Amino acid sequence: RRKKAAAKTHMRLNVGTMLPAFAVVEDAAHHDSKRADALCAGLKDGDVLLADRAYVDFLFLHGLAARGIFFVLREKENMDFEVLEERQHPDRRILKDQTIRLRGKLTADKYPEPLRRVTAVVEVDGRDTEMTFISNNFAWSPRTVAELYRARWVIESFFKELKQTLQLADFVGYNENAVKWQVWVGLLAHLLLRFLKHVSKWGLSFSRLAGVVRSAVWMKIDLLDALRKYGTAGGPKRPVIVEKQLYFQGFEPFSSRPVG
């Protein structure tokens, strides 16, 4: 019988390299916004934060803006605001481009400056979906705001890749420390596989790479050389099993039995 185990990984993923820059692994009871400060502590002036609406904490976002950091996040549905300016755009997929100010009792004091609000039609899994974003950058085109948020979805691909190739859905232990250690080991294994992919110039899928390394890890071979040659004429030959090894003595085929 499988037991239930829950762990939450908060991660800052570099969209350009698809590599984790910072991670926090903890039990699933904490809300995402509680770890936002730790995740973004290493961001610098001019960096761009792309995050889900779970990280919409206006005091936190105001702190980012004060540090010169830009952000693009999904709007919370219950956000209370007034429209200061509305801009028209010829792009039919841009439905709204507004300058707004928060007026909610719990939000107006936390972020007193104007915000950018963009509503756009975005393709999600092959289907058009209307989405609304908030940002503190007024220089970007509204299409850029929408496309930047789409880039955030690489983290979904990252976790899908992590779960599928390293089998993080099943745990050996189920207490808090056991689950945390297994997630950390999975992240480290993923990092090592990405390093192997880079140095070997691996051109096939990541799942194929994980499968090859998994099958070769106990073999005495030059792993990098094997990965570089994999799928080519110079690749490692498959081991050949001698036919005689498949039979007990006295039960060999007649062609294999000793004469005399």
Predicted features, each with a name:
Residues R1-G260:
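Single, function-defining residue in the core of a domain
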